[in-house]
Structures are given as C-alpha cells and as structure tokens.
Amino acid sequence: MYSEGKLLKVFLIFAGFIIFSLCGEVVSQRYPPAPGLLKYLEQDVCYSLYYYLNWTSLADCKTNFEETGISDVPSTVKVRCQSKNSIRFETEPSEHWQLFILMEHDNFDPIPFTLIEPNNVFGELITTANKEYQIWSTYLDEYGTLQDWMEGPIVLKFDQRNQQPDDIKYNVTQEFKYIILGNDSYTINGKFVWNTTGDRDLCFDIANICQNTNMKHAKIWPTAHPSFDVENLVLNDECEIHVKGIHGTTKHKYKTPSCFELPECFLNNMEPEIPQDVAIAADQDLRGWWNINVAWAKPHFQPEIYNVTVRANMIRSIILPGNATETTFRNIPNTFLSAGKIYNVSVYAIIGQKASHTSRRAFTPGMLRWVWAGATAGAGCAAGGLLAATLLCCGHRRATSRVSQEDPDEKTPKEDDVEIIGIESGSADDHWEVRSDRVLLHEVIGEGAFGVVRRGTLAPGGKSVAVKMLKEFPSQEEVRSFRSEMELMKSVGAHPHVVSLVGCCSGRKPLIVAEYCSRGDLLSYLRSSWDIIVSKHTAKYYNNNMDSMDTSKLKVHKEHTKLVVNKLYELQGPCETELTPLDLLSFCRQIAMGMEFLASNRIVHRDLAARNVLVTEDKTLKIADFGLSRDIYEENQYKQKGNGKMPVKWMALESLTRRVYTTQSDVWSFGVVIWEIVTVGGSPYPEVPAARLVRSLRSGYRMPKPVNCSKPLYDIMRACWNASPRDRPTFPELHQKLDDLLHSACANEYITLEVDVDEAPSTPKPQRYIKMLIRGKLPWSRESYERPVNPTSNLYSSPPVIQTKTA
C-alpha cells in the first residue's frame, strides 16, 4: 500500500511537471515577439512614431514595449485579401494609433509591422507566400504608450493555384466628366469601374499611365464595388490603366476626349491647333540678299489668321489668312542676316485672342564662293556662260540644319534694327511681353555669378512664378546672352516636362518669368527622401503603411525633428513622404519624355543631370537649364577649360575627349541621371576621381549595377553609355523602353529602396524585397555616397549661354 501510494505521488508530481511545462510553453508562444526581436521591433516602431512625438515620448515608448502584456480581449482584425506578397486587413476604428504585427511560428526572422493612424480601418502587411503567420495588435496613445497585445487570426500559407484562376480579366469601363477651371483652362476627370469575382477578390493595386500627365497609383481597399477616380487628365491624351488583383493584372487602354468631341469645350475654348510639320529653308540671291521659305501642314480646323515671324538681327512678320500653308520672306538684307548665322522662325495660328505656335531654328548656308574666271577675248563667250551657270547654281542653294559643336555667335536684334511688316501692336508676336509692374517679387531662391532668381507673383491671377534677372551693372556680353536665352525660351515652346516661359520683360532691365517649381531640384528632392528612408528603416523592419498617413493631423516638434530643409525651396513636402519604386521609375520616364521633346526641336542640353531637373508640387518633373552652363557646381564634378566649366561625370566620352555635343551625348547623360535616381541621389563614379575619369572610360570602365537595380533597367543605362554614339538608343526608344517597364506588373521588380549588403544579390527578386528592405544595414557607405551639407546651387541661377542645336 505504501509503495502504491508512493508511486501515485511520484506520478502526480511528474504529471504536474508536464502540465506546468506545457502551460508554460503555451504562454510563451502566446507572447507575440521573442525578447530579442522585441527590442528591434520597439526601436523601429518608436522611431517611426518619433516624427510625430517628442523626445520624452520616444523614451517612454521603448519602456512601454518592455512592460506590455497580453490582453484577454481578442483582436477585431479580419483578413480581407491575401496575395503571395501581402495581406490586407480590416479592423475597428479607434481614436488611437493601432500597431499590427505578423508573428511567424518557430522563426526568428524580422517582424513585419504597420501603424494605422486614428480612425482608419484598413492596413497591409508584407508576407512570404510559403509561410504561416498570426496577427497581433495593440493600441498606442499620443505619447507612445502601448496597451496589452491582442491575439488575432491565423494567416495560412498562400496557395496560388487555389487562389488564382487562369485567364480571368477584369471588365474595366470608364466615363469622363468635363471640368472648366477658369482662365480658359479645361481638364477631364475620369471614373473607372470594374467587376470582382468573389469575396476573396476585393483588393486591388491601380496604376494610371498617360503620355502627357503624371502616373497615378493607388491601393483599393476591400470593397464589393471597386472604382478609381483620376483627376486632371489632359484632353486628347493616350492612357492605360492597370488593375492588379488576385487574378493578375488587367491593362485597359483608353484615350481622353479631345476638345472637338466636347461641345462645351469646342464652343468655349476653340484653341487653334499647333502648326505641325513646320519646315524652313533659306537661300541667297546674286545680290547677297536672303529669302526664307516657311511651310507647314494644313490643320484639321482652320484658324482665323496666321502670324509668321522670323528673328535674326531683325524681326520681320507677315500676317496670312487661315487657309495659308506657306510663305516666303524675301529680300532680307545681308546687314541683318549673314552666311552661317542662326535664325528663328515662329508660326502662330490665331483665333480671336488665342494663339498656338511652333518655333524652329536653323543656320543660313555658308559664305558664297564667288568664282571669277579670267579668260582671253577669244574664249570670253564660253567662260561667261560657264560663270553664269555656276553663279545661278550657287545662288539657289538651300539651307540644311547641321550640328554645332561650339556655341554659335548669335546676336540679338538692336532696337533700331527691328523691322515689322503687317503686324499690329498687341498681336500674337508680343504676347510674351509682361509689364514689370505686374510682377511682385519675393525672396531670393537662387543666385549665380551673373544672375539672381526670385520667387514672384504674377498679377492679376496671382500665379507663382520664378523671375530671373541680371545683377547690377551687367556687362554687354551678359545682357546679350540673357536676351539670347529669352529668345531661345520663346522658340522652344511648351511641354509638360520642360520648364516653360511664362513671360518676359525686354526693357532696359530684362526679366525672364518662368514656371515656379515649389519642390526644388530633383537631386535635393531625392536626397531628402533618402534621409526619410534611412531614418524610418534604421533597424530591421518596414512600416509599409506610413506613406498613407495624413501628416497634417500630427504634432511635429521642430526642435527635435531630424528633417533637413533646403531653405532655397519649400522642401517640407518631400520630407513628409518617402518615394516608392514606382515614383522613381516614373521620374526616369518623365525625363525621357522631356528630352524627347527637346531632341525633336534639335536642342542639345549639354548639362543634363538630376540637379538640372525641377520638381513641382504634384511630382511632375521639368527639365531646366537646357543648353545652359551653370555658375556653381559640386566639388570634382566639373573640369575647368578656359572660362567654361564642364560636368565631367555626366558627359559622354566624345564630349570629354573631342568637345562634341549632340543629342546622343545627352543620351549618355540620361543614363547617368537614371543611375542618380535609382541610387536615390547618389554621386556618380564615387570611386573614380574626375582627373582619371577619361582614362577609365576609354579603357571600357562603366559604373557597376547598383545593388537595388534590376538587370533590365541597368541594361538601359549601359546602352546609354555605349562608346559609339550611333549605337546608343534615341530618346523616343528610351521613352518606349521605360513605358514597357512601367506597364509590367510591379515596379519593385526593377528598383528596391533598400538592399541587403550582406548577401547583395545582383537582381533582387520580388519575394526577397521585404527581407532586403527591413535589414538594418545601409546599402551605400559614407565613402561611396557623397552628400553635401548644403545645396550647392539651384536650377534657376545658371548664367545664360547660347543654345546648341543638332541637325
């Protein structure tokens, strides 16, 4: 009996130990993160909140992480959509911040998390397809205090075969609404609707890509009636919307209505068509005087009149009826236009008070070679006939545009050289002129050796502009160059991705009034975004929902903020949201579109770089300073030759060795700009001194592929850096290649915003994206990523230098 009782006692003790151990194991598994991971999680979450909390709250936030327990109240979160890369969930709204994490069983990988701001109900968490997770959540107050963790649902492994039926496309339909903005401005708003295929098919990623407007993208949260609104579409634009859901991506092409398809727009707007296919040619008669022929295509809708203007050392205009398609300026004296000089021709189509125009530039043919033949009296008749035939042949040579490797010696017309024929005061030819009293000047936003740029307001509409002017006591050469720049900007015309002329004052104190881009230059914009990426991802986590927060509702303590602001521009905007891979790819495409326009106008930029591209409030990129030299440069970026500075790290090999500048040399520079964008503001050739660059390029060296860049995108860069200019792609081809990349399913396949330097795969795969993004080490070292403490200059402060043109 005693032995049986003792045996029973031992059994009970052993059973109790087993039960205690099992219970302890269950409790330990219910606690969300392991202690080591909890430390990393608290760092990343608290630093993410640091942008909206003060310094004391940051310390409290870390302490609260250590003291948080487990709540008996279950979480209200529900998984609504699941794909191979993420889940999207819905929760109850709260007046507090909510923190959601994904715990993987028996694994010590970093923990994906997301923060949802007060009163929001949807969120997204990054997953890996072949893993099983559990969601945990908690609340945080405005001081960073955490409540107890609440246990949420299990997220099962994603089975793509069961989730994604084959060959299913969404039926996308659209309707457009015509909007009158005032001031003779019009736009289109589009609404796109598509079907769903069941309860698991309720979440979508949308990208809208148009030829003439910015790409727009959005996440569609769970809804049984999905739709997407696109505002501010351009009339007569070709677009494509991508709807990515559980069944893959459906691409729907559409074209926005033209003004002529909308009765209200047609009646109220009636913009004359821009003259197309403008061709110009000059020939010289036997007296040495010039005739310039101008021809253009017949428009679909005839304007009231045409105003055709030629500018050389004089201005001459002709008014023509609306059915005209050709005219000739005859008997221009060689005192106004000489051989081998540049001239500009503008064709304005005019209806009422509205005008559209196209401008072209060309060189007159070289000096005539007069051949005088001496002959004897007996052979005089034959020699005279031969001489006459030679002169007639030479006298009617046509002009052809040709490449200029040096700046042409162009002169602007003097006031007493102006000759105007058949033009009335206030007509289309002087519509650029703005009275100086209409421009209200504000603070200086840029300053160079020769000029100053101020932010301005243009009356009466109150439009923000950038006003460029010369400094006090300019030289005659500076005034001449400034006026040449003014005429050049008139002739370039308007494009969505080129900084356009708003107006000018051509009086004694000339002014250039241009578009104002509030976010400054692209290089500073990229680097400010990089600062945000580094600060938000210092440890081992990625908060993929922060970019959707309304930061205007949050309290920011400026005395503790980490934000670095370039005071030359309003850079608070870039510091509020980080860029996405889709943004970076769109930036490359926008620059290609702007350069395609300049190349079509036979304009060579010669200084294409991220610092020479401006960013507007809505992330539209505009190429600036095309064809101009800059005053101030970053150290080791420009090499002095005579009185000119050269952007050696952006220049093509032939430009460095032979000073040849063509559109194809701009293509080389564009490849460097792509590299700047992919590296989010990195300095090119970080390991190569400028003095050794030419030797390195000649030997075949090219910048290696950035670790966060895919092979297809890097192949585009390498194609731009081909040693043979003829073998480089053209800008239309680059535009098409970037369109093809954007049309693919996921921009993350081509660019990631952070990389794992421990493993550094040459081509990051999509399933590795989150792991690379949440690792704690930075992808670029201080030595290879040069960042100036202060901006070296801005895009408006370049000295005006004459434009270079190609054939």
Swiss-Prot record:
InterPro entries noted in UniProt: Kinase-like_dom_sf, Prot_kinase_dom, Protein_kinase_ATP_BS, RTK, Ser-Thr/Tyr_kinase_cat_dom, Tor_FN3_1st, Tor_FN3_2nd, Tor_FN3_3nd
Family: Belongs to the protein kinase superfamily. Tyr protein kinase family.
Cysteine disulfide links: C46-C61, C81-C203, C210-C239, C259-C265
Gene: tor
EC annotation from Swiss-Prot or TrEMBL: 2.7.10.1
Domain Protein kinase: 439-738
Cofactor: Mg(2+)
Organismal lineage: Eukaryota, Metazoa, Ecdysozoa, Arthropoda, Hexapoda
Pfam families linked to this entry: FN3_Tor_3rd (PF23008), PK_Tyr_Ser-Thr (PF07714), Tor_FN3_1st (PF23006), Tor_FN3_2nd (PF21468)
Active site location: D607
Catalysed conversion reaction: L-tyrosyl-[protein] + ATP = O-phospho-L-tyrosyl-[protein] + ADP + H(+)
Gene Ontology CC terms: plasma membrane; receptor complex
Name of the protein described by the UniProt record: Tyrosine-protein kinase receptor torso
Site entry (Implicated in PTTH ligand binding), positions: D205, K219
Family matches, as SMART domains: TyrKc (SM00219)
Binding site for ATP: I445, G446, E447, G448, A449, F450, G451, V452, V453, K468
Function: Probable receptor tyrosine kinase. During postembryonic development, involved in the initiation of metamorphosis probably by inducing the production of ecdysone in response to prothoracicotropic hormone (PTTH). Binding to PTTH stimulates activation of canonical MAPK signaling leading to ERK phosphorylation.
Subunit structure: Homodimer; disulfide-linked.
